[in-house]
Amino acid sequence: MKTIGLFFTLLLFITTISAQEKQKQVSFDAKFRKAHQGKVKIEIHEVKELLHIMIAITASGLENDDMVAQTGNYYKDVLKDFEAFKQEPIILTFDSLMKANPLNYIFLTGNTLSYQFKGNKLKADKNYLFPAQNVSSHTTITVNPITTYKKEIEQFAVKTRFRKFYKQHTAFYRQIVADYNNFANLQQQWDWLEKNFNTRVNNYTIMCSPLINGLNYTTSYTDNDFKQIMMVLPPLEKNPALTDKQNQVFNTRIMFTEIDHNYVGAPTKTYKEQINIALQDRHKWVDTTKEGTEYYPNPSRVFDEYMTFTTFYLFCQDAFAGDNAAIKYAYDDINAVLKIRGFMKVQAFNDELLKLKQNNPGKKIDELYPQLIEWCKQQ
């Protein structure tokens, strides 16, 4: 199968557009804040799942098993019920958008939250207005594509009897949510991050789809002093080649390295100028021949990605204390994943951050940045 280098973590920076230019993304009213404060929500959103299915049957989706998870009975069900409609004009339109820029995957699926089904029509959501407007500094949109193609999406849903398909798979969706609640340790991760960083978050929301594979990303929304971290993730995996503990570490890593973007980002912004100097020689830190590294175009983005994964190793030191096998698996896994993706100094970075934390057990990770940046500068 063809891939296009989407096996990496994307962070949607909402700060790349000025307040004057950017349209309002969300509206967290009192009812929303009360319902979500201090809570974790995992959802297979109905309109979002429709768009995942529509993308899955585009030519781009059918040939790309990194963009679309193409294994399991659910994918077989999708093909059985929907592949016959792959020549529909709206599917061809979405395919052309994907071929023009693969990041349209995010703009299409991410903006589905701005609508809910009401019968056969899409009704505007009052809390999520235009949530996915830009991906880093690379691509920005000013018109919600779900609004643009609303009529065609509604017609496709009716023609394919999508809502019946979604209802028939409700039990499967519920099991995905239950697995996250039972095995992902999200509350433990949340508690650890808020203990070790200065950042505070009001709510975590996971938007999941059985059709998500390599393209996982996270973003945050703030309105009325309420901060929500939203992660877009695949279902938890159980690899038969791994032990139960290794599977736990693996699945925790997938989620943790989405969550902690929102914690490492604040001190990175504080020390941006120092980081730009310390990591100015890009070729020391990134193998630019690796596909996907172009989405980390500056020192701050590179530093953040190193921090995201190596902070997970600090978490493992606490979460799996005394379990040397689990900690070693986490260490080897982190180093292998980032090296494959082109972040070749991960092991040294990992070791240095661990040493700093062990030597300064009472300090927040934010406070370790000056020493870590100085170490980077000396490399």
Model-derived regions: residue spans:
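Auxiliary, metal-adjacent structural segments of Zn-dependent hydrolase domains
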Residues: 170-228
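Bacterial Sec-dependent N-terminal signal peptides
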Residues: 1-27
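Active-site recognition of the HExxH zinc-binding catalytic motif
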Residues: 249-273
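N-terminal mature-domain "stem" immediately C-terminal to a signal peptide or N-terminal signal-anchor/transmembrane
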Residues: 21-122, 340-350, 354, 358-362
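Active-site scaffold of zinc-dependent metalloenzymes
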Residues: 133-137, 217-249
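Long, mid-chain structured domain cores
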Residues: 84-184
